[in-house]
Amino acid sequence: MNCSANEILILGGGLTGLSAGCVLTRAGLNVKVFESDAEVGGLSKTIEKDGFRFDLGGHRFFTRDRQVDEFVRDLMGGELISVSRTSKIYLRRRYFDYPLKPMNAIFGLGIPTTVRIMADYGAEKARGLIKASEKVSLEDWVVSNFGRTMFNIYFKEYSEKVWGIDCSRISAEWVAQRIKGLSLAKAVKNAFFKFSGKDLPTLADRFIYPKLGIGRISERLKEEIEKTGDVRTGTRVEGLYHSGFRIESAKVINHKGSAVLRGNEYVSSMPITNLVRMLNPAPPGHILDAASKLKFRDLVVVALMVDRERVTDQTWIYIPEQNIPFGRIHEPKNWSDQMAPEGKTILVTEFFSFRGDAIWNADDETLTKTAVENLERLGFIKNSEVIGSAVVRAAKAYPLFEVGYKELCDKLYNYLGRFENLHIAGRAGMFRYYNMDHAIESGISTAAKIIEKSAGCAAPEGEEGRLVFAVNGR
């Protein structure tokens, strides 16, 4: 086997690809990163317009992985601040605390509804003790852990708004991983005894954040790579040529033309569905068929510049109700006061969509008008206060975890794993719901494997990604 890894081509300039590139560059390897967008970062980028800054939905950084935490803190230096997480759920024309606070829920939903929630939860737990049932869908899992009433009140509407399909079609494997270990009982316990996220990472009270937006992490990674390597934005990968389960070259194209480049190792964080279709010769039919069945959810972000110092005091506001077209709001100035000019603020609304649907195809003016009208109806702003706007469409923002997705992914993993110099990584690359820290760790661990391979030795079992010298550049 060829253990040389002097030239590494990284296909995708999101957090995973950039983290891999940074670690590999610091280890002295030659790196080229290709990103189809005009800017690096993927979904973790910050948009700047007229002195206002906003992320594509707001992305917090929180991790329990010491190495990833050190990697980001070392990278960002003095740019990081600590932010308190304060979130609300807008439901039935009321605001509820998230995480759940029992008294808030009791007075908000009313005692009869609260009693019904607790009774349903108790009944589900008793039913589970008598006969365990298979939890195939999100609906199965949530009803088992929260009860039918809570599912109908909150989880059903919000989940179907976010994912665009019925809860019975959303995989339980995803939701179990996403809010692992969380149940109604634990949420109530957390409300009375604050853990600050120690035991329930999805309920972390504080997180770190760059003063100028989450995109600064991607920008700093790019700067590190470009000390000796190359990051090419606006450059699309169109083909991967292979022989004997070894990638031999990649065809890339940008405004200057196309080129075929050779590398020793290839890291792909692009959507796994795109990767499979780019392989030349084409994969077997059953592999192409599996890839065609995996789908992504798209995102449209509408940001409104507002002539007011502050609108809310929240990190996020979740809106499950179907009569409101967006699913979440955040106010970047509550994350960092440098995200808007003095005396002004900015509100960001997230519209979940499928590419080609009415939301995706609506023009910017229509989307802006829709956001303003609904925010005004909710009592947040007045139309006269809006002094500017921006609309950003993010295709393939989130893998869509339909029932059966894992079996499809396993087919692709098994096939792609046969290529000796191809490494798939990241959220879209692995078709997994990675938070920021997972995306970064995926890049670090992929880089570690390549570094060990280039040194002619395999990483010990379970030690991938633990190369501190490569991570910290020392």
Task: Give the label of every model feature segment.
Residues 2-16:
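Beta1/beta-strand and adjacent pyrophosphate-binding region of the FAD-binding site
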Residues 11, 25-48:
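Glycine-rich FAD pyrophosphate-binding loop
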Residues 20-29, 228:
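A short, Lys/Arg-enriched amphipathic alpha-helix followed by its capping loop at the start of a domain
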Residues 27, 235-384, 392, 464-468, ...:
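Mid-domain catalytic core of redox enzymes
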Residues 50-129:
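Dinucleotide-binding Rossmann-like beta1-alpha1 core, especially the glycine-rich loop
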Residues 105, 119, 123-245:
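Active-site/ligand-binding neighborhood in enzyme catalytic cores
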Residues 337-342, 395-424, 428-430:
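FAD-binding beta-loop-beta segment adjacent to the flavin cofactor pocket
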Residues 428-450:
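A conserved FAD-binding loop/helix module that cradles the flavin
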